[in-house]
From Swiss-Prot:
E.C. code: 2.7.8.7
Protein name: Holo-[acyl-carrier-protein] synthase
InterPro entries in UniProt: 4-PPantetheinyl_Trfase_dom, 4-PPantetheinyl_Trfase_dom_sf, ACPS, Ppantetheine-prot_Trfase_dom
Molecular function terms, GO-annotated: holo-[acyl-carrier-protein] synthase activity; magnesium ion binding
Binding-site positions, Mg(2+): D7, E58
Function: Transfers the 4'-phosphopantetheine moiety from coenzyme A to a Ser of acyl-carrier-protein.
Cofactor: Mg(2+)
Top-level taxonomic group: Bacteria
Keywords: Cytoplasm, Fatty acid biosynthesis, Fatty acid metabolism, Lipid biosynthesis, Lipid metabolism, Magnesium, Metal-binding, Transferase
Record's subcellular location: Cytoplasm
């Protein structure tokens, strides 16, 4: 069985948040590893990289069927992951991968998710992420 989540982000919204709130916004949304990874991107592509990671966090939350804490003033009755609970990191080959902790990891374990795949892409204006979660039902 597969679960899928996709999210599209306007790069300008991330750029505006960084310009307005600076390090406070970056530290709230991105882990230290994510911030460091985006810092090595050329300045012109930094906002695209940040937007793609934001989209990945949202897409992963959608694939898991959970929300993200801190993204609005609405109340929900299901678990919500913190923004740092879903981390976009690179593997040894440079491919983006997801590292889950907290509510995100607990939910993935409860759903018996065996693997996550993430794909990121962006233009100057938009960033998109797709997350596929694989559940092994062979033992069911």
């Amino acid at each position: 069985m597969l679960y899928h989540g996709v999210d599209l982000v306007e790069v300008r919204r991330i750029r505006q948040a960084v310009m307005r709130y600076g390090q406070r916004f970056l530290a709230r949304v991105y882990t230290a590893a994510e911030r460091a990874d985006c810092e090595i991107a050329p300045q012109v592509m930094r906002y695209e990289a940040l937007a793609a990671r934001w989209a990945a966090k949202e897409a992963c939350a959608k694939a898991l069927g959970i929300g993200l804490r801190g993204l609005g003033a609405f109340t929900v009755d299901y678990p919500r992951a913190g923004l740092h609970d879903i981390e976009v990191v690179r593997d040894a080959a440079g491919r983006p991968t997801l590292h889950l902790s907290g509510v995100a990891a607990q939910t993935a374990n409860a759903l018996q998710i065996r693997a996550l795949a993430v794909s990121l892409s962006h233009t100057d204006e938009l960033a998109i992420a797709s997350v596929v979660a694989w559940v092994d039902l062979s033992g069911v």
